């Protein structure tokens, strides 16, 4: 299995195709397998790199809470690219991965050719902060007490996932199965140290105003916790090549 090291943590990755590189950064509820259809398509013309975040086997699962958090996730993208000798790439992130990808664009500007930011920003708006943090910590406790298999049933039937079940049952079953296979400890610490502690995207207003990387924001029309912050980002922060 191919691995790279990021601050001493082993990250599993897969590389498919040849051409200009695209780095895919997965969401909390999934792993690199969620990008299968995208890799099948884009690897015809691009080099596609997917990887599992720290805490997601077969990547290393540290038991030290200090080894988790959004700053580590941003640096993990950069360290993966450095290990693979990639100077810059298109970066595509979903949800939690979109948060890391967007902040990667702030910290490592020269390494990002463009950013595709999908479903970013849960809990970013002031009225959502308290409820989001409470939910994140409750889910972390559930992973420890009940395990990934039972929590997968809760998450896969939540409001933001139910349309996948309605429209693509096979895809939904695959999502649920993958989530059941995740590490209890890795998922809990990711939720506690990354999701529950990450700053609001609104805190980066000045940095976003200076961003000159092409950014595509994408959000589902029923992704209620992300709609408002994406509109806010478009109007106030990101120039989006205007």
Q: Model segments located where?
A:
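Active-site glycine-rich loops that stabilize anionic/oxyanionic intermediates
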Residues: 19, 27-30, 95
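Serine-hydrolase catalytic-loop signature spanning alpha/beta hydrolases and amidase-signature enzymes
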Residues: 27-37, 48
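Active-site loop/oxyanion-hole signature of alpha/beta-hydrolase fold enzymes
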Residues: 39-40, 49-92, 96
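Flexible "cap/lid" loop of the alpha/beta hydrolase fold
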Residues: 106-107, 112-146
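Conserved alpha/beta-hydrolase catalytic His-Asp/Glu region
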Residues: 127-131, 146-207
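Short beta-strand/loop motif that positions the catalytic acidic residue
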Residues: 211, 217-219
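Conserved alpha/beta-hydrolase "acid-adjacent" motif
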Residues: 224-229
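Catalytic histidine neighborhood in serine/cysteine hydrolases
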Residues: 234-242
């Amino acid at each position: 299995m191919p691995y790279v090291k990021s601050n001493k943590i082993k990250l599993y990755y897969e590389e498919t195709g040849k051409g200009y590189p695209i780095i895919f950064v997965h969401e909390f509820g999934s792993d690199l397998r969620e990008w299968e259809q995208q890799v099948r398509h884009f690897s015809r013309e691009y080099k596609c790199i997917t990887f599992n975040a720290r805490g997601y086997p077969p990547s290393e699962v540290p038991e030290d809470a200090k080894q988790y958090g959004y700053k580590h996730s941003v640096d993990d993208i950069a360290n993966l690219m450095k290990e693979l000798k990639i100077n810059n790439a298109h970066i595509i992130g979903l949800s939690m991965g979109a948060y890391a990808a967007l902040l990667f664009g702030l910290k490592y500007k020269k390494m990002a050719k463009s950013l595709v930011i999908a479903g970013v920003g849960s809990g970013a708006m002031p009225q959502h902060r308290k409820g989001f943090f409470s939910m994140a910590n409750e889910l972390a406790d559930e992973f420890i007490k009940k395990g990934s298999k039972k929590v997968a049933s809760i998450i896969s039937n939540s409001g933001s996932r139910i349309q996948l079940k309605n429209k693509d049952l096979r895809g939904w079953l695959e999502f649920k199965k993958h989530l059941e296979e995740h590490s209890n400890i890795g998922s809990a610490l990711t939720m506690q140290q990354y999701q529950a502690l990450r700053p609001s995207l609104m805190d980066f207003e000045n940095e976003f105003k200076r961003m000159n990387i092409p950014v595509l924001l994408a959000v589902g029309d029923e992704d209620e916790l992300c709609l408002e912050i994406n509109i806010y980002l478009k109007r106030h922060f990101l120039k989006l090549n205007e």
